[in-house]
Amino acid sequence: MKNIIITGGLGYIGTELCKIYSGVSWNHKITVIDNRFISERVNQLRNWNINFVHGDILDKGLINKYCKDADIVHHLAGITDVPRVKKDSNDSIDNQIIMVGEKGTQNILDVISDKCKIIFPSTHVVYEGLDKVKNDINEDENTKPVLAYAISKANNEKQLKDSGKNYIILRLGSVYGYSTDTARIDIMPNLFSKIASQNGTLKLFSGGRQVKSLVPLIDVARCFKYMEERNDIS
């Protein structure tokens, strides 16, 4: 039996991951930590034998209580409702995004044991400042974040690499897909689907030659579960 923690378990990826764990939740101790309380979803978690803790990753005492004996931490919590372009940003918003990401991640790293595996979702936008489009980027490419969300993720990657802990970083493309619990209409494919279903018209610029990295939500959730299962991947 593993002691598994999912921070941000009521979010877009976390919700789908919990659905996958619902099939094996009786074989493990699974706890979701989220600073939101959505009664229907919390009740569903409890029906799946998944514990719910209403709390924040910035609360180090709470993180210590639940993470110190963890075998696995899926660290999904953080601010995701972020500015997509520089003109929508300001110092206050940027500082909050970076602070929550860094402090929350450090709180977890400070209390987990060396045997614990922490699995973290980074993002392809850590490359957003590259001077030209590349189709063959791998994990050894130097990152070049510009906006606060990407800067926060790049900083979190460094925290994990410098921690000496057992970690896995997944640099995800733009996650998309239908979720019965969480709508993310701000994501391009989801927005396109909504417009198309309403007989809307999509306007393409630059001849429709834009390139975007996409990955289905269900595949991301399955990947997190797979990373938890494989002891030879770290």
Which role does the model predict for each range below?
Residues I57-V100:
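NAD(P)H-binding glycine-rich loop region in Rossmannoid oxidoreductase-like domains
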Residues N47-L58:
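Rossmann-fold cofactor-recognition segment
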